[in-house]
Design a protein with these regions (language model features):
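Conserved phosphate-binding elements of NTP-dependent enzyme cores
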Residues: 1-960
Length: 960
C-alpha cells in the first residue's frame, strides 16, 4: 500500500492562535525545518502554542480519567486540524535549574556515571597519611599475625569508639553483658566494672579486649576463631597490641590505613554524591560554599563608635540587651561604647564578634536592675546567623544577607565532597579534579586513560568509560566544550541550558519524535554553528522531525525546509509568506529572503566614533578564567565584546565591570570578581543593565506599567469631568488596589487555576471578561474609550489616540520607535519574548532625560530578533550613543559586531583556553589582524558583495 501524503508530512489546518490568521502549513516529516520571521510575527505561536500545545494535549488524553480531572481547564489550541503529529518534545531557552545543587554533571547524568566509575574502579588513599588503603581477608590477617608476632604475648582488640566525647556508661554495660571483662580506654587497659563511666566532655578511644594469647603456629585454630570474633565486634576492623612494647597495629576487612587506623566503608556511588549525606562535605552540606560575615559590611566606618552606629547591623545605640552585652565585654578592656571601633583592642573586637566562652556579667547599673545578672554571649556573628536561620520570614533573611558574603568552603575547598570521597583516585585524579576539567579536557583524559589501568581495573571501567565518552561527545558536538561538570546550572545562559538538553536528547536515541527548539544558536559563536547544525541533522537522521524557531542565516541555509511567518509583526503578521526549500526562498521577495540574498543589509557605518576622549580602564581582571586582563572602554562609543563561547566575555562584563559600577553608583551588595583597580569612574554618572529578563513575574506587569506611562494615563482619566463628578482618585483606575478593579479576579483579568503537578493555568475572569475593572470604572471614557480599552490598544493605535496628549505620546512613541508598535499597552509581560522585554526596557531608558554620561550594558540583545529587528535595535543603540552615552554589547551576531565603533575580542578558546584579551580596536583592525576566530568571520562580513556572492553560489549548487 502506498504512503499517503500525511504519512510524509505534518499538516496544520486553520491555525488561529494569538495573531495567526487561519494559516495552513505543511512540514515534511524526518526533516530539519526552520520557522523564521520578525519578532512577534507568530513563529512561537505556530511552533509552541499550536504544534507543541496540541502534542501535549493529545499526550494528556492518554492519562487516566482521575489524572485528567486536574487538567479540565487546559484549552485545545485554536486550530482546525493537525495530522501526522508525532510525540512532541520541546527544548526551550530557559535556565535549567535554580537549585544551587544542580550542576552540568547532574543535569546530563554524566556525574552519575562518574560516581559509578569511582565506586567500582578507583583506588582509596588515606586522607591522613596519603598512603594507599589496604584490606585483608580473615585468612590473610591470621597469616600476618602469625608471621609478625610468633612467640609474642598479644591482646586482640576490637575498636568501638574513635575520638568521640561521651560517658559511655551504656556501652560498658553492653560489653559486660557480652562477657568481655577488659577494655582499653585511651591507651590504658582497664577492667570493665559495673557503673563504669568516663568524662563526657573529653574525646575518648575505646577498644574491647576479645582475647589475650601467646601467638604460636600450633594454636592457629584458636587464633583464627579469636580474629573472627574480634573483627565481628569491631565492625571489620581489629587491633593487635604487643604486650612487650605496647605498640598497636591495625588489621581490617575494610579499606584501612594501617598507620592511622582510619577505615572507609565499601565504596558505593552515593559516597561520591554531594547530594547525599554519605558523600557531602559536612561543613557546606555539599554546596561548595559557605556564608560568612563580611567585616567591611558590618563595620563600614571604623572611625565611628558603636554608640554612633559603627556596627551596621545594630545601628545607633538603643536600650537593648545586645548593647548591654557589648558594653560589658568592652568594660573588661577598659573601653566603652563611645570608643571609636578603630581604637578597640583586637581581643575586644574578637569577643564582640564571636562571643566568649564563659558567662558574661551584666552590671546592675547597665541593665537598670537591682542586681547584676549573668548571660551567655554568643557574639554578633551568631546574632546575624540566627536572624538568617530564623522563622521570621524572608525580610529577616534579607537583612542578614546584606552583612554576609559567600566564600569557598574552607573544608572541601569548593569540591562539595567529604574528605573520604576526595581520597579516592582514578588514574591519579580525584572525582573533583575530573569534574573541574573542561568537557574537552575531560574527553581527552578519558580517551587515553585505559592504557594507564591494570587488566582488572580496565575490565571494570571499560563499559562505564564507553558511556561517559558517548555523553561527553554529545556535549562537544553542540559547542559546550568549555563547560565543566562542576559548573552550577544556575550560572548557565538560556542558550547553554538548551544545548545541554539537546545533547541529552541526542544521547537518548529516540526515534519518530517531533523536536521543537527555540533558537538553539543563542550564545554560540559562528565557529561553533556548524557543530550545532550537524547535531540537529544527527537528530533528524535518527528518524525524527526537527522544527527550529531560528533567525540564524547559517541555520536557515542548512535546513531542509523553511517557513517564513510575516509579513510584519503583531496584527500585521500571522501569515505564511513562504514555505519551501532554502534555495527557493532566496529567489523570493520576502523580508527574510532580502536579508539572506543581500538585497537588504545592515549597513556598515562610513566612519567609526572615536569617543569623547575619556576612557574607563579596568585593570587586572582575573575572575573565573580571566588571566589578569586589562581592558580599555572608550566612553561615548558603541563597544562590542566578542569571542567564542566561554572565552570570558560575561565574566569580564557581567561579573566584574557591572558589579563594580553598581557598587560605585548604587551601593549594590553584589560583589565583583577579582580585579586590581578601575580608572575613569569620574567620567560616568550611572550604569544601566538592559537584559532580556521578564518585565515582571506575574500577568499584572505590562509595558504601560513598566514605562510609567500608565500613571499618566490614570491621571488623564481622573481629570475627566465624569471622574470628577464621581469623586474618583487615581487609585480608582489602578487594577492593583481595591475600588476600581474587579474584585472577583482582584484586577488580574484572569483567574489562576492551580494544576498541582503542572504549571498554573490562567483563564479569563468570568465577571469582567479580562477587562480587570468593575462596571462603574469602565463608564468613565476619554474620546469614547474606557481605560480597559486603552490597555487593549496596540502601541501604534495608542500613538494615534494620544497624539494631542504630549506627556503620554512621548513615552509610547518611543515604544513605537524601537519596533514594538504591534504589542498592546496592557499586554501581560509573561507573554512577551526576551527580545520584546529588552526593547521595552530600552524604550523606557530612551524616554528618560540623561546627562550623556551613562553606560548601558546589554548581553546578547539580538536573541529572538530577526534581521529587520536587529536593524531597528541598532538604530536605537546608535541614538543612545549619539547622545554621548556609552553602550557595551556582548554579542556573537556579526551584524552587530560590524557596526560597533570599538571591539574587545576575548579568547582564543573557551574555558581554560580562554580568558585572554586578543584584540581591542576597530572592527576593521580585528578583521585584518588575523587574531582569533571572530576576526576571520568578520573579515568575510566586511568584504563588499560577500553575501550576494555566497547566495549565488548556494542557489547554483542547489539547482544542479
Amino acid at each position: 500500500m502506498s504512503e499517503t501524503k500525511s504519512d510524509n508530512n505534518i499538516e496544520i489546518y486553520g491555525a488561529r492562535v494569538h495573531n495567526l490568521k487561519n494559516v495552513d502549513v505543511t512540514l515534511p516529516r524526518h526533516s530539519l525545518c526552520v520557522i523564521t520571521g520578525l519578532s512577534g510575527s507568530g513563529k512561537s505561536s505556530l511552533a509552541f502554542d499550536t504544534l507543541y500545545a496540541e502534542g501535549q494535549r493529545r499526550y494528556i488524553e492518554t492519562f487516566s480519567a482521575y489524572a485528567r480531572n486536574f487538567l479540565d481547564n487546559l484549552e485545545r489550541p485554536d486550530v482546525d486540524k493537525i495530522t501526522g503529529l508525532s510525540p512532541v518534545i520541546s527544548i526551550e531557552q530557559k535556565t535549567t535549574s535554580k537549585n544551587p545543587r544542580s550542576t552540568v554533571g547532574t543535569v546530563t547524568e554524566i556525574y552519575d556515571f562518574l560516581r559509578l566509575l569511582y565506586a567500582r574502579a578507583a583506588e582509596a588513599y588515606s586522607y591522613v597519611t596519603g598512603e594507599k588503603m589496604v584490606k585483608y581477608t580473615e585468612e590473610r590477617i591470621v597469616d600476618m599475625i602469625l608471621t609478625a608476632y610468633e612467640g609474642h604475648k598479644v591482646y586482640l582488640l576490637a575498636p568501638l569508639v574513635r575520638s568521640r566525647k561521651g560517658h559511655y556508661k551504656e556501652l560498658f554495660e553492653t560489653v559486660r553483658r557480652k562477657g568481655f571483662l577488659t577494655v582499653r580506654v585511651d591507651g590504658e587497659l582497664r577492667e570493665a566494672t559495673p557503673g563504669m563511666r568516663l568524662d563526657r566532655y573529653k574525646n575518648h578511644d575505646i577498644e574491647v579486649v576479645v582475647d589475650k594469647l601467646t601467638v604460636k603456629a600450633k594454636d592457629a585454630e584458636r587464633l583464627h576463631k579469636s580474629v573472627a570474633q574480634t573483627l565481628q565486634q569491631g565492625g571489620g576492623v581489629m587491633m593487635v597490641l604487643d604486650a612487650a612494647d605496647n605498640q598497636t597495629r591495625f588489621f581490617s576487612k575494610q579499606l584501612m590505613d594501617p598507620a592511622s587506623g582510619i577505615a572507609y566503608r565499601e565504596p558505593a556511588p552515593h559516597n561520591f554524591s554531594f547530594n547525599s549525606a554519605q558523600g557531602a562535605c559536612p561543613k557546606c552540606k555539599g554546596l561548595g560554599y559557605v556564608s560568612v560575615m563580611d567585616h567591611d559590611k558590618v563595620v563600614p566606618d571604623d572611625k565611628l563608635s558603636i554608640r554612633e552606629g559603627g556596627l551596621a547591623p545594630l545601628g545607633k545605640y538603643r536600650n537593648a540587651l545586645i548593647f548591654w552585652e557589648i558594653q560589658s565585654v568592652l568594660a573588661d578592656y577598659d573601653c566603652d561604647l563611645k570608643t571609636p571601633i578603630c581604637d578597640l583592642p583586637p581581643e575586644a573586637l574578637d569577643e564582640v564578634f564571636n562571643g566568649r566562652a564563659d558567662r558574661l556579667r551584666i552590671p546592675a547599673q547597665v541593665a537598670h536592675t537591682t542586681d547584676d545578672y549573668y548571660v551567655e554571649f554568643d557574639g554578633l556573628v551568631k546574632y546575624i546567623q540566627q536572624m538568617a536561620d530564623s522563622d521570621m520570614g524572608a525580610a529577616s533573611q534579607r537583612w542578614a544577607e546584606q552583612f554576609s558574603k559567600t566564600t569557598v568552603c574552607p573544608e572541601c575547598h569548593g569540591a562539595r565532597l567529604n574528605k573520604e570521597a576526595m581520597a579516592y583516585r582514578f588514574a591519579g585524579k580525584t572525582i573533583a579534579e575530573l569534574s573541574n576539567m573542561d568537557i574537552a579536557e575531560l574527553y581527552d583524559f578519558l580517551s587515553n586513560v585505559e592504557i594507564q589501568l591494570d587488566s582488572k581495573h580496565r575490565a571494570i571501567a571499560h563499559e562505564i568509560l564507553k558511556e561517559l565518552m558517548s555523553r561527553l561527545k554529545f556535549l562537544l558536538d553542540v559547542g559546550l566544550d568549555y563547560l565543566s561538570l562542576s559548573r552550577s546550572s544556575m550560572t548557565l545562559s538560556g542558550g547553554e541550558s538548551q544545548r545541554i538538553r539537546l545533547a541529552t536528547q541526542i544521547g537518548s536515541q529516540l526515534v519518530n519524535v517531533l523536536y521543537i527548539l527555540d533558537e538553539p544558536s543563542i550564545g554560540l559563536h559562528q565557529r561553533d554553528n556548524v557543530r550545532l547544525i550537524n547535531s540537529l541533522k544527527e537528530l533528524r537522521d535518527l528518524g525524527n522531525t526537527v522544527v527550529v524557531v531560528e533567525h540564524d542565516k547559517d541555520m536557515m541555509l542548512a535546513a531542509d525546509y523553511v517557513v517564513d511567518i510575516g509579513p510584519r509583526a503583531g496584527r500585521l503578521g500571522g501569515e505564511v509568506v513562504f514555505e519551501g526549500t532554502p534555495a527557493q526562498m532566496l529567489q523570493t521577495q520576502t523580508l527574510t529572503s532580502q536579508y539572506l540574498n543581500g538585497r537588504r543589509a545592515i549597513e556598515v557605518p562610513a566612519t567609526r566614533r572615536k569617543g569623547n576622549g575619556h576612557v574607563l580602564r579596568l585593570v587586572g581582571a582575573r575572575g573565573n578564567n580571566l588571566k589578569g586582563v586589562t581592558v580599555n572602554f572608550p566612553l561615548g562609543t558603541l563597544i562590542g565584546v566578542t569571542g567564542v563561547s566561554g572565552s570570558g566575555k560575561s565574566t569580564l562584563i557581567n561579573d566584574t565591570l557591572l558589579p563594580i559600577l553598581s557598587q560605585h553608583f548604587y551601593r549594590s551588595l553584589r560583589e565583583p570578581l577579582a580585579y586590581d583597580r578601575i580608572e575613569g569612574l569620574e567620567h560616568v554618572d550611572k550604569v544601566v543593565a538592559v537584559d532580556q529578563s521578564p518585565l515582571g513575574r506575574t500577568p499584572r506587569s505590562n509595558p504601560a506599567t513598566y514605562t510609567g506611562v500608565f500613571s499618566d494615563i490614570r491621571s488623564l482619566y481622573v481629570n475627566l469631568p465624569e471622574a470628577k463628578i464621581r469623586g474618583y482618585k487615581p487609585g480608582r483606575f489602578s487594577f492593583n488596589v481595591r475600588g476600581g478593579r474587579c474584585e472577583v479576579c482582584k484586577g488580574n483579568g484572569y483567574k489562576t487555576i492551580e494544576m498541582n503537578f503542572l504549571p498554573d493555568v490562567y483563564v479569563p475572569c468570568e465577571a469582567c471578561h479580562g477587562k480587570r475593572y468593575n462596571h462603574e470604572t469602565l463608564e468613565v471614557r476619554f474620546k469614547g474609550k474606557s481605560i480597559a480599552d486603552v490597555l487593549d490598544m496596540t502601541i501604534n493605535q495608542a500613538v494615534e489616540f494620544f497624539e494631542n496628549v504630549p506627556n503620554i505620546l512621548h513615552k509610547i512613541k518611543v515604544l513605537q520607535d524601537v519596533g514594538l508598535g504591534y504589542i498592546k499597552l496592557g499586554q501581560s509581560s509573561t507573554t512577551l519574548s526576551g527580545g520584546e522585554s529588552q526593547r521595552v526596557k530600552l524604550a523606557t531608558e530612551l524616554s528618560k532625560r540623561d546627562t550623556g554620561q551613562t553606560i548601558y550594558i546589554l548581553d546578547e540583545p539580538t536573541t529572538g530578533l530577526h534581521f529587520e529587528d536587529i536593524r531597528v535595535l541598532m538604530d536605537v543603540l546608535q541614538r543612545l550613543v549619539n547622545r554621548g552615552n556609552t553602550v557595551i554589547v556582548i554579542e556573537h551576531n556579526l551584524d552587530v559586531i560590524k557596526v560597533a565603533d570599538y571591539l574587545i575580542d576575548m579568547g582564543p578558546e573557551g574555558g581554560r583556553g580562554g580568558g585572554q584579551l586578543l584584540y581591542e580596536g576597530t572592527p576593521e583592525g580585528l578583521a585584518e589582524s588575523g587574531v582569533g576566530y571572530t576576526g576571520k568571520f568578520l573579515k568575510a562580513e566586511l568584504t563588499p558583495s560577500h553575501t550576494a556572492q555566497q547566495t549565488d553560489n548556494f542557489i547554483n549548487s542547489n539547482n544542479k
